[in-house]
Design a protein with these regions (language model features):
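A short glycine-rich, Lys/Arg-flanked "PGG" loop and its adjoining helix->strand segment in the class I
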Residues: 227-237
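A conserved beta-strand element that flanks and buttresses the S-adenosyl-L-methionine
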Residues: 213-218
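A short acidic, Gly/Pro-enriched loop at the edge of an enzyme's catalytic core
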Residues: 203-212
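Conserved SAM-binding strand-loop segment of SAM-dependent methyltransferases
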Residues: 189-202
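Conserved SAM-binding loop of SAM-dependent methyltransferases across substrates and taxa
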Residues: 154-166
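Conserved SAM-binding loop
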Residues: 182-183
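Feature captures hydrophobic
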Residues: 1-127, 133, 140
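Conserved class I S-adenosyl-L-methionine
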Residues: 143-151
Length: 237
């Protein structure tokens, strides 16, 4: 019944300071670049499991309490998300090389979590199951329903909804690369009249829709803009 233990090695002095200041980011980056390693036959999973079971101890530390207080005070400023800032944030994250995203996404470039209904599901199967699950929740029970996809990414969900249900889909994205890629897909599939993707902030949309879906985009809205988001969605239905 010995208490669990994990041995980690920090390979330079700056790592401990970075972890103390921003553990959520610094631990992952240190493990990724090799400046934090797990020793004596342990794994990163052992380390995370042990850390998770001791969060109450960490939260009691003075430095952690100060950091949490500062984080809570500055979070509204960090998440201030007016139109111009939103566009720059999206460009920084998504307007990158296609080759990069193809390295780790499924063939449909779904960027949100898959729906793993089996331990043996592949990434492709999980992402298709997610799209099927979303379509079911939207109750697209007749062709031609006008459907808005806020944060439409590379277009996979919108195209799937049209192909499976006959929905008329408009997707909104702030990424030039995503919009260009998604529009090319509609051209290749010859469905431009039924599915379109616009380079536009959802706050500028004025058309009315039968259904609205937004997957994995809400984290970009910002706490101060939650009410604005739901009010806008309500006005478009």
């Amino acid at each position: 019944n010995q208490d669990p233990s994990v041995t980690i090695r920090l390979h330079n002095r700056s790592v401990s300071r970075k972890i103390a200041l921003n553990p959520r980011l610094a631990v992952g980056e240190a493990y990724m670049d090799g400046s934090l390693t797990v020793e004596d036959g342990g794994s990163i999973y052992d380390f995370l499991d042990l850390t998770g079971s001791n969060l109450h101890v960490l939260d009691a530390l003075t430095i952690v309490r100060i950091r949490n207080w500062l984080s809570g005070w500055t979070r509204p400023l960090q998440q201030h998300n007016p139109l111009g800032v939103a566009r720059k944030n999206v460009a920084h994250h998504y307007d990158l090389s296609d080759d990069l995203f193809d390295l780790f996404l499924d063939s449909d470039r779904q960027y949100s979590c898959g729906y793993f209904d089996s331990q043996n599901s592949t990434l492709e199967q999980a992402q298709k199951a997610k799209k099927r699950h979303l379509a079911s929740k939207l109750i697209l029970d007749k062709p031609g329903l006008k459907t808005l996809d806020i944060g439409s990414g590379w277009g996979g969900l919108g195209i799937y909804l049209h192909q499976e249900t006959g929905a008329n889909v408009t997707g909104l994205t702030l990424s030039k690369e995503q919009q260009k890629y998604a529009e090319k897909r509609t051209q290749d599939l010859q469905i431009q009249g039924d599915v379109r993707f616009l380079l536009q902030d959802y706050r500028r949309e004025t058309n009315l829709y039968d259904r609205i879906v937004s997957v994995g985009m809400f984290e970009h809205v910002g706490i101060k803009h939650y009410g604005e988001f739901f009010n806008k969605v309500g006005s478009l239905l």
